UniProtKB/Swiss-Prot annotation:
Alphabetized PANTHER family for the sequence: F-BOX/RNI SUPERFAMILY PROTEIN-RELATED, FBD DOMAIN-CONTAINING PROTEIN
Disulfide bonds: none
Organism field: Arabidopsis thaliana
One Pfam family this sequence matches: FBD
Record domain F-box: where: 1-47
Entry protein name: Probable FBD-associated F-box protein At5g38565
Residue ranges of every copy of the FBD domain listed in the record: 263-311
Amino acid sequence: MDIFNGLPDDVLVKILSFVPTKVAVSTSILSKRWEFLWMWLPRLDFGSPKTDLLAFLNTCQYDKEEEVGLVDFIDKKLPLHRAPFLAMYVCWKFLMNVGMKTYFHVRHLETRQREGKSLQDILSICPVLDDLSVICSVHQDVKEFTIIVPSLQSLTLFIENCEVFDGYVIDTPLKYLKLEDVHEEEHYCLLKKMPKLREAYVDVQLDDLKSLIGSITSVKRLNHMFREKSKILGQLLKDSPNLRVLNIFKVQGHVTLSTGVDCWNQPISVPECLLESLQIFNLSHYFGKQQDLDFVVYILKNACHLKTATILADEPEHLVPNLKELTLSPRASSTCQLSIRCGLGSERS
């Protein structure tokens, strides 16, 4: 024990981070110095089975006349927590079973969903939540879910090919949305309008997501992942009149060297964002195929207020076709700086 007492607090906290949460908290009875050390831990894991969880709670310092429970622990101990950031891992199903009598004042929450109803149950006890990540992975039986959180500002939603999946509803005034919906079967996606949305990351497998298009009209920064046969980009540009920054990525293995940007569907009329607001354009995984060239040239010759355009190619310069044509292509903005960066560090302007 004398060996540990001679170590600085940050080293002791590092040591505590390698042991289970219940063990770390139990060290608070060792001495006055150890009483609050566990409160500097950046991660607390309460994902234990019920029996282990209750055993853990009994190691905490409570008034023995008061009811011992996880909610009591969170109410009394977490407000004293001193770490600048806390990741709390908890068995939500256990919380639902024991019955909630209080609210969780958590602002950041990540959850892997197995049941749609349980998600809304969790959200209903988080009234000040502003950052939420929801993951629906393969083999998880999530049929549908709804997200209604008035305080929510940032949402990350990842949906894989779940075995049974009908769709989802999002009704919250977001400022940031990251949507990775790669579920290949038909499903509904109902996103209510988000007038405060400023940035969106969109990676979707299906094109028929009309509510998605209508919900991002106020976005100023758009990050979009190209997928083979997807034709949603033209519609995204058309319905984002305030767009200032456009970042385009391409899924390696989906958009190949032979296909290029085959999913670019040129709009009938020039989108308003190109004529009025777009200032920064970035494209990664440029292959130099004719489809790639046509897409970039379209942006350059129609973006009247473009300041910078950066094109990133994976291959060395001598393996990327049409670079000269791209460099000499007309630009609607006389102040636009075009930068083309190829593999192995070569660059041309």
